[in-house]
Regions:
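Extended hydrophobic/Leu-rich segments
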Residues: 11, 45-48, 52, 177, ...
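The feature captures the conserved acid-bearing segment of alpha/beta-hydrolase catalytic domains
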Residues: 16-99
Length: 224
């Protein structure tokens, strides 16, 4: 459960869906915002108290419900706390539910919280490629939020700092967080485009952090 929940957030752009079982990770380890375009199914026993799996699963459910309300049609999920069950649960419902969904390779809305996993950062996410991160600290996080409306692209890039608001008294596990955002002051991002995202025959405008960064026509090519 832990591994697939983390990978669902880290590699969401590769996936159609993910089905962690008997998991429940702190959301800092697997930001739910990254899962806008995947189907997410998490099942945990309501009595699975080890490392607060049941409580953390509840927090994950709350977050997915919040995101789905903000972005109707995105953040498809089913998150269950199974009454009377501990760490041993019925895994069989997960696969039939997931098989209903297909991957969206061309989303016009992208939310990516770039975070470190095992000493590595992703170099890109969907059609975004990072040439230069805004912060050289490997532990620093960055939020990239892109929206495409007709031929106008809006990209907001922010530094993300977590503030722990709940920690368990026994193990010191960070349970709940508040995120603070500040606009990034530097960095370089390539936005890859195709016919599925914009009309390449028409002029395109790009706005980054409230300022127009590009206006004009682009010529399709296969260079990287």
């Amino acid at each position: 459960g832990y591994g697939s929940q983390r990978l669902a957030s880290f590699y969401a752009d590769y996936l159609a869906g993910a089905g962690p079982m008997a998991g429940g990770e702190p959301l800092k380890n697997a930001p739910a915002e990254n899962c806008a375009h995947i189907a997410f199914y998490l099942r945990t026993g309501a009595d699975d108290r080890g490392f607060y799996r049941n409580i953390l699963t509840g927090y994950v459910k709350e977050e997915f419900e919040r995101l789905q309300a903000l972005h109707p049609g995105l953040y498809t999920h089913q998150i269950e706390l199974i009454p009377g069950k501990g760490h041993s649960i019925d895994y069989r419902p997960t696969t039939p539910w997931l098989k209903q969904y297909t991957r969206n390779p061309y989303p016009k809305y992208v939310y990516w919280e770039d975070f470190e996993m095992d000493g590595l950062h992703r170099k890109g996410f969907y059609n975004l490629f990072v040439k230069e991160r805004p912060n050289d600290d490997i532990n620093a996080r960055t939020r990239y939020e892109m929206s495409i409306t007709d031929n106008h692209i809006t990209l907001n890039v922010d530094n993300v700092v977590y503030e722990t608001v709940q920690k368990d008294p026994r193990w010191g596990i960070e349970m709940k967080f508040r995120k603070n955002y500040t606009p990034a002051a530097k960095g370089k991002v390539i936005i890859y485009l195709c016919d599925e995202l914009v009309d390449l025959k028409k002029e395109i405008t790009v706005t980054v952090n409230g300022k127009q960064a590009f206006q004009g026509k682009v010529k399709p090519h296969l260079k990287t």
